[in-house]
A protein has these predicted regions:
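A short acidic, Gly/Pro-enriched loop at the edge of an enzyme's catalytic core
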Residues: 101-110
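Conserved S-adenosyl-L-methionine
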Residues: 47-51
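Conserved SAM-binding motif I beta-strand of class I
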Residues: 67-72
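Conserved beta-strand signature within the Rossmann-like core of class I S-adenosyl-L-methionine
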Residues: 134-150
């Protein structure tokens, strides 16, 4: 957390009003994915629109044998992620300064995302980046979403599995927070 406080004073990586709830709103929220899914050795996960490194950094710590590529279109955020990963000696994280549509050279077992775009767009960007996986992790798009998702899911024409995070973590913050999983078929 101290690393993020220091970087946030220079570059607005995380909303300043959110820093007092850093663990709950960012770390624990990201780790809700680990409460639902396991990622295996040598699986490759893309964190699309990683922002300050969430959910990618907490997941990479939790799954040290899984490879994570954290991508964002804002270069200053990628700079922060590189510094954080180096400071905590996180060897299974690489970064890419890129928009989702511009990633053409990789195939991943899983794409994860948090607070980036509507499901329709996330699936459109993610699907070409996914490969059929033989690993134990989720093979498809896993995203963290909030609020009433009825319209967003309908407009996406996806049929994701949906888990209520509040059933995993009792904190008030997690009411109306969900994990969505759209499998690659």
């Amino acid at each position: 957390q101290q690393l993020y406080i220091e970087w946030n004073s220079k570059i607005n990586v995380i909303s300043r009003k959110d820093m007092e709830n850093f663990y709950l709103h960012h770390v624990l929220h990201s780790l809700s994915i680990a409460a639902q899914f396991q990622f295996g050795k040598d699986e490759e996960v893309l964190d699309l629109g990683t922002g300050g490194g969430f959910p990618g950094i907490p997941l990479a710590i939790f799954f040290p044998e899984t490879k994570f590529l954290l991508a964002d279109s804002v270069n200053k955020k990628i700079t922060v992620i590189k510094e954080v990963a180096a400071a905590i000696d996180l060897k299974n994280v690489s970064t890419r300064h890129s928009r989702a549509e511009d990633i053409k050279d990789g195939k991943f077992d899983t794409v994860v995302s948090r607070a980036v775009a509507p499901l329709k767009d996330l699936w459109q960007w993610s699907r070409p980046l996914l490969r059929k996986s033989k690993g134990e992790g989720p093979n498809g798009l896993v995203c963290l979403k909030g609020g009433d998702l009825t319209l967003e899911i309908a407009e996406s024409q996806c049929k994701p599995f949906v888990w209520d995070i509040h059933s995993m973590f009792a904190e008030e913050y997690f009411k109306e927070k969900y994990i969505l999983f759209q499998p690659l078929k």
